[in-house]
Curated annotation (Swiss-Prot):
<keyword id="KW-0547">Nucleotide-binding</keyword>
<dbReference type="GO" id="GO:0030543">
    <property type="term" value="P:2-micrometer plasmid partitioning"/>
</dbReference>
<feature type="domain" description="Kinesin motor">
    <location>
        <begin position="54"/>
        <end position="417"/>
    </location>
</feature>
<dbReference type="GO" id="GO:0007018">
    <property type="term" value="P:microtubule-based movement"/>
</dbReference>
<dbReference type="GO" id="GO:0005634">
    <property type="term" value="C:nucleus"/>
</dbReference>
<dbReference type="GO" id="GO:0051231">
    <property type="term" value="P:spindle elongation"/>
</dbReference>
<keyword id="KW-0505">Motor protein</keyword>
<keyword id="KW-0067">ATP-binding</keyword>
<dbReference type="GO" id="GO:0090307">
    <property type="term" value="P:mitotic spindle assembly"/>
</dbReference>
<keyword id="KW-0132">Cell division</keyword>
<feature type="binding site">
    <location>
        <begin position="139"/>
        <end position="146"/>
    </location>
    <ligand>
        <name>ATP</name>
    </ligand>
</feature>
<dbReference type="GO" id="GO:0000073">
    <property type="term" value="P:initial mitotic spindle pole body separation"/>
</dbReference>
<comment type="similarity">
    <text>Belongs to the TRAFAC class myosin-kinesin ATPase superfamily. Kinesin family. BimC subfamily.</text>
</comment>
<dbReference type="Pfam" id="PF00225">
    <property type="entry name" value="Kinesin"/>
</dbReference>
<dbReference type="InterPro" id="IPR001752">
    <property type="entry name" value="Kinesin_motor_dom"/>
</dbReference>
<dbReference type="InterPro" id="IPR019821">
    <property type="entry name" value="Kinesin_motor_CS"/>
</dbReference>
<feature type="region of interest" description="Disordered">
    <location>
        <begin position="1"/>
        <end position="49"/>
    </location>
</feature>
Length: 1129
C-alpha cells in the first residue's frame, strides 16, 4: 500500500499513471473511509429535467423438474419463443387464458448466455460511464434465481499470461459473466482503472459480510467479554459528498469489506468463497434452496481526461447484482422449526418489497423502505437514480400456479415504476489521491500500533461501546457497593432477628415440651378412643345382628302363629262338623226313637185292637163252637201271642239296644275326637310355650350380654367422652396458640404503635424544637432590631449627649427592660406551650393506646370465658343419653349419670385450664400494657427533662444576658463619668484643650446651645460597681448637683479657644464590629461546630443556644459602642 501511495504521488507529479496490473490486491472497510470535500469537475446531466425510464422487467420460465414430472403436473405457462414478450397463463379449471406482457420473455429454450446478452451486458457499459445499475432476480423457491444470477462459478480454463482470460462453463450465470466481460471492456476503454467488489448476505434480517473470514468475526465478538456484540454492519444514509451517488445522497453500508481485484479470476474466487458461506438448506421444492438474500456489488473507478481542459477525472460506477431468496408456501415446502422461521422472515421482506412496489406504482406519499433491510438496500434501485431491471423466474407446472400468478402480478406492477438515472459525480484525481494517502496513514498507524503492541485500532463506535461498558461497570460497581452496604445492614438486622429468634426458640422449646406431654396424653387417649370406637363398631354390628335375629324370630313366630291358628281353625271346623253330624245322628236317633215309640204305641194299640177283635171273634167263635175247641185255640193263641209278644219285645229290645250302642258309640267318638283335639292343642301350646321359654331365656341371655356390652360401651363412651375432652383440650391448645399468635400480633402492633408514637413524639419534639428555635430566633431578631434601634438612639445620644442624657438613659432603661421582659416572656410562653402540646399529644396517644388495649381485653375475655366447649359436650351428652334411653332399659340411667358426672368433671377441668390459659394471656397483656405505660412514663419523664432543660437554658441565657447588659451599662456609666470629667476640666478656668480642627465659634456659645442635663427622677437599679462609678462621676464634677438632679451651665472658658475644638467625649470603635460566636443548638449539642454572624445582620442561622455560649466570650470577642443597655430587676 505504501508503494501504491508513492506511485500515485509520482503519477500526480508527472501527469501519467501506470497500468492497472501494477496495483496489489487491497481491501478497505467503508466504515474507515474518511469523508473529505471532493472536487466536483462536472456532471454530465443535471438533476432537473432528467428523463424518467420504467424499470425493465424480464421473465424466465424454466422447464418442469423431476418432482413436477413425477407428480404429473400439467403445464399452465406458454411463451412465444426466443424473442417473445408475452406470457400466456392457462387456467385449467375454466379453460381461460390470461396474457402478461414484459420487456422480454425467456422460455425453456433460452440459455445462460442469451440471458446475459439480453439483460446484463448493456449495464456493464452503463456502469463504466458512471451510472449506478441494479439487476435482481425475484420469484418462487426452486424457479432458478440463483442459477440465473450465479450458475456454475467454476472456471473451465485460464491463461497465466493474460489473467483476464477466463473460460466459463455454459451454465455460468450473470455475475461471473459480468466479471469477465467487465475487465475486457475496461481494457478497451482505459488503462487506468480500479475495480472493487463487496458481497453482502441478508439472513433473518441481519447483515453479514461474506468476504470476511469467520475467524475475524469471532475474534471481534470475543472482545466483548461475553456481552452481546453490536451489529458490525449497519445501514446509514450516506453523506452528501458521496461520489457514488448523482446527487450526493444514497444508502451507505457501514462496516462492509470492499476488496480490490485486478482480474476476473480474483473476482470469481471471491464470489466462490462468499457463495460457499451463504445459508442454504434442502426443502421439498428444491434440494439446495437459498435461505438468504445476497447482494454482489461491483464498483469501478475509471480515469479519463477532459477533452477541453485536459484535466484528469474519475468516473465512478456501481453495479448491484441481487439474488433474492425465494418466496415459498411453508406447508408445501415442508419447512419446520428453524426453516419455518427463515421462510417467515423471507416472506416478510418480500412482502415489504411488494408493498414498496405497490406504493411506487400508486405514487403514494410514503414509501415503506425502512420496514425491511432488503427494501432499505434497494431503496435507490426502486424509484431512485439507478438503472434497474428485474428478472422474474417462474415455474410452468400447475402445482405452482398460485406462486406463478403472484410473481407475474408483482412483475407487471413493477413495470410501472419509473426511475431517473443520473451519472454519478465526477471526482478529481487529486482528491482521490488525498483520500488514498489518508487511508495509507491510517493503515500505518494501525500497523505501528500492532508492531509496538501499544494497543489495537478500534473504531469510534467500538470505543464509545467500550466507554459505555466501562461506565456500566462503574455503575454496577456502585450498585454492588450499595448492595454490600445493604447486605451489611441486613446482616446486622439478621443478627438482631437471630437473637430474637433464639429467645423465641427457647419459648418455643418450652412450649414444645408441654406440647409433647399433651401429645403423649393425646396419643394414649387416641389409642383408647380408637379401641372404644372399634368396640362401639362391634357393638353396633352385634346389635344389628341381634336386631336382625329378633326380626327374623318375630317373623317366624308370626308365620308359626298364623299356621297354628289356621290349623286350630281347621280342627275347630272339623269338630263343629262332627258335632253337627253327631247332633244330626242324635236327632235322627231321637226321631227313630220317637218313631219306634210311636210304632210301639201303635203296635200296642193295634195289638190291643187285635186282641180286642180276637177277643170279640173268640167270644163269637166260642159262642158258636164248642167249648172244647175254643180252649184248644185259646191256648194255642196264647202261646202264639206270647211268642209274638216275645219276638216283638226282643225286636224292640234289639232296636233299643242298637240305638243305645250307636248313641254310645257316637258319644265315644265325640269324646275321643274332643280329647284328641284337646291333646293336640295342648301339645301345640306346650311346644309353643317351650319355644317361647327358650326365646325368653335367649332374650334374657342376650339382654344380659347386651347389658354387659352396654356397660362396656358406656365405659368406652366415657373414654370417648374423655377423647372428646382431649380433642377439646387440643382445640383449647390450638386456641391458645391462636391467642398467643394474636397476642404476638397485638404485641407487634403495639410495638409498631409505640414506634409510631416514638416517631410522632420525635417529630413533635422536633417540631417543638423548631418552633422554639424559630421563636428564639424571632426573639433574637427582635432583640437585634432593638439593638440596632439602640445604636441609632446612641447616635442621637451622641448628637444630644449634653441636653438629653437623662431622658435617653431613662428611655433606654425602660425600653430595654420591657423588651427583655417581653422577649423572655414570649420565649417562656412558647416553650411552655410547646411542652404542654407535647404532653397533651403524649397523654392522648397513651390514652388511645390504653383504650386499644382495653378493647383488646374486652375482645379476648368473651373468647376466654366462653362455655362453647361445655355446650358441645352437653349436646354430645344429651345425644348419648337419648340413644341410651331409646336402646336400653332404665337400669342404665345410673351408669349414664355417672358418665355424665365424669364428663362434667372433665369439662370443668378443661374450662378451668382454659380459664388459666386466658388468665395467663391476660397477665401477659397486662404486662404489655404495663410496659407500654412505663414506656409512656419514660417518654413523659424525658419530655419533662427536655422542658426543664429548655426552661433552665432560658433562665441561664436570660441571666447571662442580664449580666452582660449590666456590664455594658457599667461601661456606659463609666464612659458618662469620663465625659463628665472632660466637661468639668473644660469648665475649669485654666483649661487648655487642644483640638485638631479649629472652631470658628466660641466655646461658650457652643456650650450655651447644649440643653441642661438633669438627674434621673427614678434611681437606676445598678450593681455596686456601677453606683461607685456614678458617685465618682458626681464627685469629680462640681457643677453636677445630685440633690437637685440638674446640671448647671458651664462658665465662659478662659483664653482664646477659637483655634481649638473639643475632642468628642464618646469612644468610637476604630475597627468594624467583630462577629459574635453562635453556640450549638439544642438539637446538635454533640457537634463542635460554631456558627458566627455579624451583629448588625439578621442571620437565619441564629438559634436558641446561640446566646447561651456567646455570653462568656462577649467582652473579648466583641467591640461595642457605648450603648445604653440597662437591665431592670
Amino acid at each position: 500500500m505504501l508503494e501504491q501511495a508513492e506511485k500515485l504521488m509520482k503519477r500526480n507529479s508527472s501527469g501519467a499513471m501506470s497500468a492497472p496490473q501494477s496495483k496489489p490486491l487491497a481491501r478497505s472497510r467503508s466504515s474507515t473511509m474518511p469523508t473529505t470535500t471532493q472536487k466536483r469537475v462536472r456532471s454530465s446531466q443535471q438533476s432537473e429535467g432528467e428523463p424518467e425510464y420504467n424499470i425493465k422487467v424480464y421473465v424466465r420460465c424454466r422447464s418442469r423438474n423431476e418432482r413436477e414430472i413425477r407428480e404429473k403436473s400439467s403445464v399452465v405457462i406458454s411463451t412465444l419463443g426466443n424473442n417473445g414478450r408475452e406470457v400466456i397463463l392457462t387456467n385449467p379449471g375454466t379453460g381461460s387464458n390470461k396474457t402478461y406482457t414484459f420487456d422480454r420473455v425467456f422460455g425453456v429454450e433460452s440459455d445462460q448466455e442469451s440471458m446475459f446478452n439480453q439483460v446484463a451486458r448493456a449495464y456493464i457499459n452503463e456502469m463504466i460511464e458512471g451510472y449506478n445499475c441494479t439487476v435482481f432476480a425475484y420469484g418462487q423457491t426452486g424457479t432458478g434465481k440463483t442459477y440465473t444470477m450465479s450458475g456454475d462459478i467454476t472456471m473451465m480454463g485460464s491463461s497465466e499470461d493474460d489473467p483476464n482470460f477466463v473460460l466459463l462453463s455454459e451454465h455460468a450465470g450473470i455475475i461471473p459473466r459480468v466479471l469477465v466481460e467487465l475487465f475486457r471492456e475496461l481494457r478497451e476503454v482505459s488503462e487506468d482503472y480500479s475495480v472493487k467488489v463487496s458481497f453482502l448476505e441478508l439472513y433473518n434480517e441481519k447483515l453479514r459480510d461474506l468476504l470476511v473470514d469467520d475467524k475475524d468475526v469471532s475474534l471481534e465478538d470475543h472482545n466483548f467479554n461475553g456481552m452481546a456484540p453490536p451489529e458490525s454492519i449497519r445501514i446509514y444514509d450516506s453523506l452528501k459528498t458521496d461520489r457514488t451517488s448523482p446527487n450526493g445522497y444514497s444508502i451507505f453500508v457501514k462496516g462492509m469489506e470492499e476488496m480490490y481485484i485486478r482480474s476476473a479470476q480474483e473476482g470469481l474466487k471471491l464470489l466462490m468463497d462468499g457463495s460457499l458461506k451463504r445459508k442454504v438448506a434442502a426443502t421439498k421444492c428444491n434440494d439446495l434452496s437459498s435461505r438468504s438474500h445476497t447482494i454482489f456489488t461491483i464498483t469501478t473507478n475509471v480515469t479519463k481526461i477532459h477533452p477541453i481542459s485536459g484535466e484528469q477525472y474519475v468516473k465512478v460506477g456501481k453495479l448491484n447484482l441481487v439474488d433474492l431468496a425465494g418466496s415459498e408456501n411453508i406447508n408445501r415446502s415442508g419447512a419446520e422449526n428453524k426453516r419455518a422461521q427463515e421462510a417467515g422472515l423471507i416472506n416478510k421482506s418480500l412482502l415489504t418489497l411488494g408493498r414498496v412496489i405497490n406504493a411506487l406504482v400508486d405514487h403514494s406519499q410514503h414509501i415503506p423502505y425502512r420496514e425491511s433491510k432488503l427494501t432499505r438496500l434497494l431503496q435507490d434501485s426502486l424509484g431512485g437514480k439507478t438503472k434497474t431491471c428485474i428478472i422474474a423466474t417462474i415455474s410452468p407446472a400447475k402445482i405452482s400456479m398460485e406462486e406463478t400468478v403472484s410473481t407475474l402480478e408483482y412483475a407487471t406492477r413493477a413495470k410501472s415504476i419509473k426511475n431517473t438515472p443520473q451519472v454519478n459525480q465526477l471526482m478529481a484525481k487529486e482528491s482521490c489521491i488525498i483520500e488514498y494517502i489518508q487511508e495509507i496513514e491510517r493503515l500505518r498507524k494501525e500497523l505501528r500500533a500492532s508492531h509496538s503492541k501499544e494497543g489495537i485500532y478500534i473504531t469510534q463506535e467500538k470505543f464509545e461501546t467500550y466507554e459505555s461498558n466501562s461506565i456500566l461497570v462503574e455503575e454496577q460497581q456502585a450498585k454492588i457497593d450499595n448492595l454490600q452496604e445493604q447486605l451489611r445492614r441486613l446482616k446486622e438486622k439478621f443478627l438482631e432477628q437471630t437473637k430474637l429468634i433464639k429467645e423465641k426458640d427457647g419459648q418455643i422449646k418450652e412450649l414444645d415440651v408441654a406440647n409433647r406431654k399433651y401429645l403423649e396424653q393425646s396419643k394414649d387417649l387416641t389409642i383408647y378412643i380408637n379401641g372404644i370406637h372399634s368396640k362401639l363398631e362391634d357393638y353396633e354390628h352385634t346389635m344389628i345382628g341381634i336386631h336382625n335375629n329378633n326380626m327374623k324370630l318375630l317373623e317366624d313366630i308370626n308365620d308359626n302363629r298364623g299356621n297354628i291358628h289356621e290349623d286350630l281353625l281347621a280342627k275347630v271346623d272339623h269338630i263343629e262338623t262332627c258335632n253337627l253330624i253327631i247332633s244330626r245322628e242324635i236327632t235322627s236317633l231321637i226321631s227313630i226313637r220317637n218313631v219306634l215309640q210311636a210304632y210301639s204305641d201303635r203296635f200296642k194299640t193295634v195289638l190291643g185292637g187285635v186282641f180286642e177283635e180276637l177277643q170279640e171273634k173268640l167270644t163269637q167263635v166260642g159262642r158258636t163252637t164248642e167249648e172244647s175247641q175254643l180252649d184248644v185255640d185259646l191256648s194255642f193263641v196264647d202261646e202264639k201271642f206270647e211268642e209274638v209278644t216275645d219276638i216283638i219285645k226282643a225286636t224292640c229290645e234289639n232296636l233299643v239296644r242298637t240305638m243305645d250302642e250307636h248313641v254310645s258309640n257316637m258319644k265315644l267318638e265325640t269324646t275321643d275326637l274332643t280329647s284328641s283335639c284337646a291333646s293336640l292343642l295342648e301339645k301345640e301350646c306346650q311346644a309353643l310355650h317351650g319355644k317361647l321359654q327358650k326365646y325368653v331365656e335367649s332374650m334374657k341371655q342376650e339382654l344380659n350380654s347386651t347389658l354387659q356390652e352396654m356397660v362396656r360401651d358406656l365405659d368406652m363412651k366415657a373414654s370417648s367422652m374423655l377423647n372428646v375432652v382431649q380433642c377439646t383440650k387440643d382445640g383449647l391448645i390450638s386456641h391458645k396458640k391462636e391467642l398467643e399468635a394474636d397476642l404476638e400480633s397485638q404485641k407487634r402492633e403495639h410495638f409498631d404503635i409505640a414506634q409510631t408514637m416514638e416517631e410522632q413524639l420525635q417529630k413533635i419534639v422536633g417540631k417543638e424544637r423548631q418552633n422554639i428555635q424559630e421563636s428564639m430566633k424571632a426573639s433574637y431578631d427582635f432583640l437585634m432590631k432593638q439593638m440596632v434601634e439602640t445604636e441609632l438612639r446612641q447616635k442621637n445620644f451622641e448628637e444630644s449627649i449634653v441636653s438629653k442624657v437623662k431622658g435617653l438613659l431613662s428611655h433606654s432603661n425602660n425600653g430595654m427592660s420591657k423588651m427583655s421582659s417581653y422577649a423572655v416572656g414570649r420565649l417562656y410562653d412558647s416553650a411552655i406551650g410547646g411542652v404542654n402540646s407535647i404532653e397533651n399529644t403524649v397523654s392522648s396517644a397513651t390514652f388511645s393506646m390504653k383504650n386499644d388495649l382495653q378493647e383488646f381485653q374486652m375482645d379476648i375475655s368473651p373468647i376466654c370465658d366462653s362455655r362453647r366447649f361445655g355446650d358441645e359436650f352437653t349436646a354430645v351428652e344429651t345425644r348419648i343419653s337419648e340413644a341410651i334411653r331409646e336402646e336400653l332399659t332404665p337400669k342404665l340411667q345410673d351408669i349414664t349419670s355417672k358418665a355424665c358426672n365424669l364428663i362434667g368433671l372433665g369439662v370443668q377441668d378443661i374450662n378451668q385450664k382454659a380459664l388459666g390459659v386466658s388468665d395467663d394471656q391476660r397477665r401477659e397483656l397486662r404486662s404489655v400494657i404495663n410496659n407500654t405505660n412505663n414506656h409512656a412514663d419514660r417518654l413523659r419523664s424525658e419530655i419533662g427533662t427536655l422542658v426543664n432543660y429548655v426552661s433552665q437554658e432560658h433562665r441561664d441565657n436570660i441571666m447571662q444576658i442580664s449580666q452582660t447588659q449590666d456590664e455594658i451599662l457599667q461601661e456606659q456609666i463609666a464612659s458618662i463619668g469620663r465625659t463628665f470629667d472632660v466637661l468639668g476640666n473644660i469648665n475649669k478656668p485654666d483649661a487648655n484643650v487642644r483640638t485638631s480642627v479649629p472652631i470658628e465659634h466660641e466655646l461658650n456659645s457652643a456650650i450655651n446651645e447644649l440643653p441642661p442635663l438633669y438627674m434621673p427622677q427614678r434611681p437606676l437599679s445598678l450593681c455596686s460597681h456601677g453606683r461607685q462609678l456614678l458617685d465618682e462621676a458626681y464627685s469629680g464634677n462640681e457643677n453636677l448637683s445630685p440633690s437637685t438632679g440638674k446640671f448647671s451651665n458651664f462658665p465662659t472658658p478662659c483664653g482664646d479657644m477659637s483655634a481649638q475644638t473639643p475632642t468628642t467625649p464618646m469612644p468610637v470603635p476604630d475597627q468594624p464590629l467583630t462577629k459574635m460566636p453562635v453556640p450549638q443548638t439544642i438539637s446538635s449539642l454533640r457537634s463542635l461546630r460554631r456558627l458566627t454572624m455579624d451583629i448588625c445582620e439578621h442571620s437565619a442561622d441564629m438559634t436558641l443556644g446561640s446566646i447561651h455560649e456567646s455570653q462568656k466570650a462577649m467582652d473579648s470577642s466583641r467591640r461595642y459602642t457605648l450603648e445604653p443597655r440597662l437591665f431592670e430587676k
